[in-house]
Each structure stands twice: as structure tokens, then as C-alpha cells.
A protein has these predicted regions:
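Hydrophobic h-region of N-terminal signal peptides that target proteins for export
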Residues: 8-17
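An exposed tryptophan-centered "aromatic clamp" motif
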Residues: 66-78, 84-138, 142-144
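Short acidic, Pro/Gly- and aromatic-enriched capping/linker segments at domain boundaries
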Residues: 17-33
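Extracellular structured ligand-interaction cores
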Residues: 29, 114-116, 131, 149-152
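Positively charged n-region of N-terminal signal peptides that target proteins for export
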Residues: 1-5
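Short, structured beta-strand segments at or near domain termini in extracellular proteins/domains
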Residues: 143-159
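Bulky hydrophobic/aromatic "packing anchor" residues in well-ordered structure
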Residues: 38-41, 119, 154
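Short aromatic-cysteine micro-motif
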Residues: 30, 35-80, 84-87, 91
Length: 159
């Protein structure tokens, strides 16, 4: 019986430990440091607020691209929308719905359409009227017009 329970527990525990970005990410309050890519991420999506001891509180705001860029400019201090390459670094194929480590990015939620799209600052070269986004529920990359409302997470370079 003990062996049976161990065999049931083992795959579940392996699945829980497989989604782990702590080898390159660390948290300092509301900022996530990415040592590998020399970036700093806001722990909370725009619209959510960081509360010490609770993490991200609230729901990510759904913003047009211009609204997200305006919010980054308002915050200053080098915060900006990430490029497609930068945002892609937060995906981990070992993580499931969302496809990133929830210990670092806890406020990624289904927007009601079985997706969690996040803006990038990168236009699609072949169709410049479309801007890349990443769906963090499924790890899909696609493009949309800048007037579509999606979540946004800001980044800044870190020397």
C-alpha cells in the first residue's frame, strides 16, 4: 500500500517541481530579476498592485497597445513593453496554464476566453499593422491590431 501511494505521489510531485524558473529568476519585492537575460520585470501585470505578504492583488487591466505604452511612460524609470524575444523568455514548456512559473508571475489568469494574451512592442515584419502578443495560457504567439485590449507586463534593462 505504501509503495502504491508513493507511486501515485511521485509523478504529481515531479510535475510540481518541473515548472521552475528560479535558476535564473529572483524576486526583490515587486521586481523580478532575470540574471540570464539582464532584465528586470514587474512582478504584477499592469492593473494589478503589489502588496507585501500577499503578492499581486487585483486583476490585470486589458489595455490597447497605446494605453500600455502610455502607462509605461507614466511610470518612467526605464519601464517599457517587452520585445517578443524578451517576453518569450518567460515561457517554460514545463509549466502549464499559465506557461510560466506562478511563483514569480502569480497574476496571469484566463481572461474568460481560455487565454491570457500579453502585449509586446514588436510589430510583425510582414504585416506591420499587427503587433505580436503571447498567450500565457497556451504559449501561443500571434499578432493583433494595436486597438485590441490585452494584458501587459513591463520590463526594463538591468546592467
Amino acid at each position: 500500500m505504501k509503495l502504491f501511494l508513493l507511486l501515485l505521489w511521485l509523478p504529481a510531485s515531479m510535475a510540481l517541481t518541473a515548472c521552475d524558473l528560479s535558476d535564473r529568476l529572483s524576486r526583490q519585492g515587486e521586481v523580478i530579476h532575470d540574471r540570464l537575460n539582464h532584465l528586470e520585470w514587474q512582478a504584477c501585470s499592469l492593473g494589478s498592485q503589489w502588496q507585501e505578504g500577499k503578492g499581486c492583488v487585483g486583476t490585470p487591466a486589458l489595455l490597447t497597445l497605446l494605453e500600455a505604452k502610455d502607462e509605461a511612460a507614466r511610470l518612467g524609470e526605464g519601464w517599457r513593453l517587452p520585445t517578443i524575444e524578451e517576453l518569450f523568455t518567460l515561457l517554460d514548456e514545463n509549466c502549464r496554464m499559465p506557461m510560466t512559473d506562478p511563483r514569480f508571475f502569480s497574476d496571469i489568469h484566463d481572461n474568460g476566453e481560455n487565454s491570457a494574451p500579453y502585449w509586446t512592442s514588436s510589430s510583425i515584419e510582414e504585416m506591420p499593422e499587427l503587433v505580436y502578443y503571447i498567450d500565457f495560457m497556451h504559449g501561443l504567439i500571434d499578432g493583433h491590431t494595436d486597438r485590441f485590449a490585452q494584458a501587459a507586463r513591463l520590463v526594463r534593462s538591468h546592467p
